[in-house]
């Protein structure tokens, strides 16, 4: 790795109870670009005996993993590296033995952080990478601990680290490897008893949204998407997956569509903990966070990345990296927002996220032109669906890409997506296409006076007659657009006024 002065590298290493993770990023254009992610299943927690002494075999697995990580740290400045140990290293009575050799291997100090500090860092990672407003409940199920955090913006209001995790619950409740109702019920009840001491505090504080920041939640989302469900986790979906798991008599026979072999061993135990959290805290829905502990460590090192609006930071970073016309993007977004208000605002596009995604796509829709004009929409879709966009979920990235794919010329119906309702989705697309057509001169002072009337899906766009006479090319393109939308069942009438 070369160390460019203008784009410094940072590394964050998390010595977890189930896996060791390493994240290497580059700080560029006001954001972070992931350069490497390395994960090794070490299952450190499984090496603890009844006296909380870590076995030599478990320590050796950890040292072997760190030998691999050490190679990637050689070219990164010491001040840009954070290495932390979590629940198992907090618990192990012989942790000094492990740390002495681990420090030698890495050539860097390892911090064994408290449960509260771990929870605070997880929250920072979530706050810096996940969009949305209001108070959020963050759930992170690790190998030997589970962190529950309530916060708003970048401020955590309640931090708790509970002594339960997918590895320890595996050993405590699924030791016989049987996936029967008795084991699941015991695991769920055990988790509830662990959570109960903090229940009143958390329910009194309350929250608006819930996000999951762990491998368990990521595995659940991958399973749901593989099975044709949307990405939002609900209690009914968790119970459905429990039933699927119980179709296998033993853990070694577990075969659920979308579940990787790597995650299978600790899946039932992690699922049990999450079911208990949903039931006890009465959670309606959960989405996957954009980051957690490792991302929190990175953002602690890079002070200038602290910005309240994560999505605004992401948009600004992408515009800078791809040299987009920011003023024009703002012009399209402003007009699209104006058209939305004329059409009925949140009565016409019900979901608040609809307006956010319309604005985002308006500001980034031309990104594909940096590759080629001819297939600009196709390139925009590919980039927006595959770039790391902190603040946006996988479903939202897919939706933004599909809207950008269709921002001009030929029009086709949208594919199935799970970001917003189908009705709102097509309305976002219609508004963006009109805003792009009406701003083609790229100067707000040259825009026409317009009025958009919506009666359900029937749109009537009234435009100043003199402007239409003075801009015959745009007038012709608007007539073509009227035909395109009407032909696929989205009636659009253009009138002069």
Swiss-Prot record:
Question: Which domain of life does this protein belong to?
Answer: Bacteria
GO BP term (any one) = guanosine tetraphosphate biosynthetic process
Catalysed reaction equations from the record: guanosine 3'-diphosphate 5'-triphosphate + H2O = guanosine 3',5'-bis(diphosphate) + phosphate + H(+)
Q: Which InterPro entries match?
A: ATPase_NBD, GppA/Ppx_hydrolase, Guo-5TP_3DP_PyrP, Ppx_GppA_C, Ppx_GppA_N, PyroPPase_GppA_Ppx
Drop me one GO molecular function for this one. Answer: guanosine-5'-triphosphate,3'-diphosphate diphosphatase activity
Q: In which pathway does it act?
A: Purine metabolism; ppGpp biosynthesis; ppGpp from GTP: step 2/2
Spell out the CDD domains in the cross-references. Answer: ASKHA_NBD_EcGppA-like
Q: Does the keyword section mention Hydrolase?
A: yes
| Record bears the keyword Hydrolase | yes
Q: Which UniProt keywords apply?
A: Hydrolase
Q: What is its EC number?
A: 3.6.1.40
Q: Which family, according to the similarity comment?
A: Belongs to the GppA/Ppx family. GppA subfamily.
Q: What does this protein do?
A: Catalyzes the conversion of pppGpp to ppGpp. Guanosine pentaphosphate (pppGpp) is a cytoplasmic signaling molecule which together with ppGpp controls the 'stringent response', an adaptive process that allows bacteria to respond to amino acid starvation, resulting in the coordinated regulation of numerous cellular activities.
Protein name per UniProt: Guanosine-5'-triphosphate,3'-diphosphate pyrophosphatase
Species annotation: Vibrio parahaemolyticus serotype O3:K6 (strain RIMD 2210633)
């Amino acid at each position: 790795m070369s160390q460019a002065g203008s784009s410094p590298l940072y590394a964050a290493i998390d010595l977890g109870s189930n896996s060791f993770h390493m994240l290497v990023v580059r700080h560029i254009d006001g954001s972070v670009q992931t350069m490497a992610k390395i994960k090794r299943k070490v299952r450190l927690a499984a090496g603890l005996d009844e006296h909380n002494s870590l076995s030599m075999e478990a320590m050796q697995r950890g040292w072997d993993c760190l030998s691999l990580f050490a190679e990637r740290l050689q070219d990164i400045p010491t001040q840009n590296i954070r290495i932390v140990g979590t629940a198992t290293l907090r618990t192990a009575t012989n942790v000094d033995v492990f740390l002495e050799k681990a420090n030698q291997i890495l050539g860097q100090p390892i911090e064994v952080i408290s449960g509260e500090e771990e929870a605070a860092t997880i929250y920072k990672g979530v706050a810096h990478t996940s969009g949305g407003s209001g108070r959020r409940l963050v759930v992170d199920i690790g190998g030997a601990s589970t962190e529950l955090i309530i916060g708003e913006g970048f401020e955590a209001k309640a931090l708790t680290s509970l002594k339960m995790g997918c590895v320890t619950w595996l050993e405590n409740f699924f030791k016989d490897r049987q996936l029967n109702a008795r084991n699941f019920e015991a695991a769920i009840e055990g988790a509830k008893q662990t959570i109960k001491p903090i229940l009143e505090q958390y329910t009194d504080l309350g929250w608006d949204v819930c996000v999951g920041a762990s491998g368990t939640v990521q595995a659940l989302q991958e399973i749901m998407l593989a099975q044709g469900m949307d990405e939002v986790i609900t209690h009914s979906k968790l119970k459905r997956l429990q039933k699927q798991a119980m179709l296998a008599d033993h853990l070694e026979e577990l075969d659920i569509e979308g579940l990787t072999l790597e995650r299978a061993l600790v899946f039932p135990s992690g699922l049990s903990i999450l079911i208990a959290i949903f039931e006890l805290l009465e959670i309606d829905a959960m989405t996957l966070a954009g980051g957690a502990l490792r991302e929190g460590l990175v953002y602690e090192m890079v002070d200038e990345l602290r910005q309240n609006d994560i999505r605004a930071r992401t948009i600004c970073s992408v515009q800078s990296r791809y040299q987009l016309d920011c003023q024009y993007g703002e012009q399209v977004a402003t007009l699209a927002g104006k058209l939305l208000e004329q059409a009925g605002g949140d009565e016409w596009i019900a979901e608040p996220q609809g307006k956010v995604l319309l604005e985002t796509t308006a500001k980034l829709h031309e990104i594909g032109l940096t590759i080629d004009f001819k297939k600009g929409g196709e390139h925009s879709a590919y980039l927006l669906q595959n770039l790391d966009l902190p603040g946006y979920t996988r479903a939202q990235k897919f939706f933004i890409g599909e809207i950008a794919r269709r921002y001009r010329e030929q029009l086709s119906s949208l594919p199935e997506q799970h970001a917003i309702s189908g009705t709102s989705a097509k309305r976002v697309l219609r508004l963006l296409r009109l805003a792009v057509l009406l701003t083609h001169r790229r100067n707000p002072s040259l825009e026409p006076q317009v009025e958009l009337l919506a009666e359900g899906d029937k749109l009537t766009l009234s435009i100043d007659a003199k402007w239409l006479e003075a801009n015959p090319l745009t007038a012709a393109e608007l007539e073509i657009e009227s035909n395109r939308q009407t032909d696929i069942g989205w009636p659009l009438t253009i009138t002069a006024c």
